[in-house]
Structures are given as structure tokens and as C-alpha cells.
A protein has these predicted regions:
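Bacterial N-terminal signal peptides that target proteins for export
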Residues: 1-9
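C-terminal motif of bacterial Sec signal peptides marking the signal peptidase cleavage site
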Residues: 17-21
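Preferential activation on post-signal-peptide N-terminal prodomains/segments
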Residues: 22-265
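A short, surface-exposed interaction/processing loop segment used at functional sites
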Residues: 138-169, 173, 270-303, 360-371
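Conserved histidines in hydrophobic membrane contexts and catalytic metal-binding motifs
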Residues: 185, 277, 347-351, 367
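Short, flexible beta-strand-to-coil junctions
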Residues: 249-251, 281, 350-355
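Charged, low-complexity helical/coil segments in non-catalytic cytosolic or luminal regions
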Residues: 265-346
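Low-complexity, Gly/Ser/Thr/Pro-rich intrinsically disordered linker/tail segments
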Residues: 339-359
Length: 371
């Protein structure tokens, strides 16, 4: 598995929060109309031009520290956005029972905790070995089969164990099509009254047996306990194919950050938002739902800075870093990034440096790096 990203993150501690970037760059854009430009004349006019003609890919090597070979996943026609108060989920136990009703007959009991809070305890009539936990703001379902899949697959780039790129997304398994697996996941969220927060397209990965075995062999080398765990589940013969479906959450078409993130300067860890499902021939093996949703609007609509401004700001963050080669950006998107109280829009840049990938976020209003 990959080494820790900690050395990369520590670099950012020495960087001050940076204001809007530097000079003009000529950028090669795919699927960008000939009269559109990322070079601002007036900030508002450029913003409208850019956001209405957002490219699907950027290929640019003219920056000082950054090289862009990046897919761009940003909605068109977004010129203004709000800051929202940050709310936790509120998953009602009755809704959980309804969501599982096509698959399991559940019962629940709400119990109090020593600190004055409460949590919901569920149990199934026909599967008393399944683990179901809900604190209203977080929900987990896991049966006995799920543990190996969960340990052998990781889509969260906030962790060094990320390996989702090793799994294909375009293969149907014999027992269920990809579309049917996605529908199962979305129907579950509909029953929890989360339909309006689902961001499309959802992510789907096919956990083929061959790739799972490859990941298992690598994991056993790195973690000898994995072999003991494998034996407790019945050995390699018990490894079976499944789908992993991830459903991001969104606010008015802009996804909420779905990877784990830590504010280095304030030591504030922030969980990703969304719903994860592992679906095998026997049905749901694993479900985890958590993160944040919008509350009330915290600020009125504000102008979003242009993509070029955000790219310049990103390049500027590396001025104090000694680089042996340019940092490569492979994906650009727009996210709502949570802090302690709010959800703030930011450009997310997926960077690759020395074989490691991580997200860097630039505030979509100020052009400052979120660290």
C-alpha cells in the first residue's frame, strides 16, 4: 500500500494563506468555444465567459510550479454561490426501517448515552450478526461478509490506502447490472429522505475477484494480521465479487467534499460527505452514510472567482517549495468544503507529486488556499 501523505501535508504548514494570483497564462482548453477566454479583462465579464464555457480538459505547462493535465468537472453557468451553515445529517430510525424493508425486517430501540445524547440500536429478524449503528448524524450497516471488501478497497484520497483507480468502473457482474446496483443505492437514500441531496453521476467500482486477490496479496505483505483475518473468514475461497457504489451529496448542483480532509493550521479533521454501499449477490453487505448537509444560508450570493485566478493561486502556493519537478494537476472540480460551522465553495485541485495524490482547495471567493 502507499506511504503516508503526511510529509506532503506538512509542507503546507509553512505556507501563508495566499491572495489572488499572478499574471496571465495561455491555456490549451478542450471543448472551449473560440471566443471564450480564461484571461480576465474585467473580472465579472471574464467570470461569465469562463463559467458559461467551462472546458472538459485543461492541458497547460506554462506555470512556474504546476503542470495541468486535468479533467474539469465544474457545472456551467455558475457565477455566484452562497456560504451555508453546516448541519449534520438527521437520519430517523423509522426511515431506516423503511429503507431496509425490501431486504431485511428490522426492529429498533432508541437508547440514551452517558453524556445526555442518544443512539438508535437496530436488529434484524433473520440476521442477528449484522452490525447496524446510527447516531442520527451517521449510519453504518455491516454484515459478516463486508469486512474483507471494506479493507481491500478504499476510494477516499484522504487516506494513504486509496486504491480505487485499480478497480474498473465499466464491468457488469453476472448477478446484477451496474445500473441496477446504482438504483439500489439511490432507492435506499430516497427512503431516508435524502433524494434532493444526491449528486449525479454516482461513482461505481466493480470489485472483481482477480483484483481483490491482487490487493489481498499486497495487503498481507504490508499487514501480516490480514492473513489471520482472512482465515477467520474462511480463507481465500470466500473472496467474492461485488460492487462499490458511492453517492456524493450536493447543494444546488455543487458536490460537497467527499474525501477526508484536515485543517493543518487548526488541527480540525473534517469527514467527507456521502453514502457508501457494497452490494454483492446476497444484497447489501455494507452501508455507511455520514458527513454534512446545508442548513440556513450564512451569506448572500457572492461572485465566484475565475478558474484561471484559482489556477494562479494554486501555482503561487508552491513558490516557497523546492520542487525537483512540477506538480501535476489531474482533476479540477468545485466543492463545498466544510469547516467548523459552514460549507464554503472552493476549487478542488487533485495534485500528483512524486507518486502521491491529494486534494488542494482554493477558496472560490477569495482565492486563498484552505489549509
Amino acid at each position: 500500500m502507499k506511504n503516508s501523505l503526511t510529509p506532503l501535508i506538512i509542507i503546507f504548514i509553512v505556507l501563508c494563506t495566499l491572495c489572488l494570483g499572478c499574471g496571465d497564462k495561455n491555456i490549451e482548453l478542450e471543448e472551449l468555444s473560440s471566443d471564450a477566454s480564461l484571461n480576465p479583462v474585467s473580472s465579472h465579464d471574464a467570470l461569465v465567459s469562463v463559467m458559461q464555457s467551462m472546458p472538459s480538459h485543461i492541458l497547460e505547462s506554462g506555470f512556474e510550479n504546476i503542470r495541468f493535465d486535468a479533467d474539469v468537472v465544474i457545472p456551467d453557468n455558475l457565477t455566484q454561490l452562497n456560504i451555508w451553515n453546516r448541519n449534520l445529517l438527521d437520519i430517523k430510525p423509522g426511515s431506516v426501517v423503511a429503507a431496509f424493508s425490501p431486504h431485511l425486517n428490522l426492529n429498533f430501540e432508541t437508547r440514551s448515552t452517558n453524556d445526555g445524547g442518544y443512539f438508535d440500536m437496530f436488529w434484524a429478524d433473520n440476521d442477528n450478526k449484522a452490525i447496524i449503528r446510527s447516531w442520527r448524524w451517521s449510519f453504518v450497516f455491516e454484515n459478516e461478509q463486508a469486512e474483507l471488501h471494506r479493507l481491500l478497497f478504499n476510494r477516499d484520497r484522504g487516506y494513504s490506502q486509496y486504491n480505487a483507480d485499480s478497480f474498473l468502473a465499466d464491468i457488469d457482474l453476472p448477478f446484477l447490472s451496474r445500473e441496477e446496483a446504482q438504483d439500489m443505492a439511490k432507492e435506499f437514500l430516497y427512503a431516508l429522505d435524502l433524494r434532493s441531496y444526491i449528486f449525479e453521476p454516482v461513482e461505481l467500482y466493480t470489485l472483481s475477484k482477480s483484483q481483490l486477490m491482487e490487493e489481498l496479496d499486497e495487503e498481507i505483505v504490508d499487514n501480516p494480521y490480514m492473513e489471520t483475518l482472512l482465515k477467520s473468514h474462511g480463507g481465500k475461497e470466500t473472496i467474492h465479487e461485488a460492487y462499490f457504489v458511492f453517492v456524493p451529496f450536493q447543494i444546488n448542483g455543487v458536490p460537497i467534499m467527499s474525501d477526508t480532509f484536515s485543517y493543518v493550521t487548526a488541527d480540525i479533521p473534517v469527514r467527507g460527505s456521502g453514502a457508501s454501499f457494497i452490494i454483492s449477490e446476497s444484497g447489501f453487505e455494507y452501508i455507511e452514510i455520514g458527513g454534512y448537509l446545508p442548513g440556513d444560508v450564512q451569506s448572500p450570493l457572492q461572485d465566484v472567482i475565475s478558474l484561471e485566478t484559482a489556477m494562479n493561486a494554486l501555482d503561487k502556493t508552491y513558490d516557497l517549495v523546492l520542487l525537483s519537478e512540477p506538480v501535476v494537476v489531474t482533476k479540477i472540480t468545485l466543492y463545498y468544503v466544510p469547516n467548523a460551522t459552514a460549507l464554503t465553495p472552493a476549487y478542488g485541485f487533485l495534485i500528483n507529486q512524486n507518486g502521491f495524490s491529494m486534494w488542494v482547495y482554493i477558496n472560490a471567493f477569495t482565492g486563498e488556499q484552505i489549509i
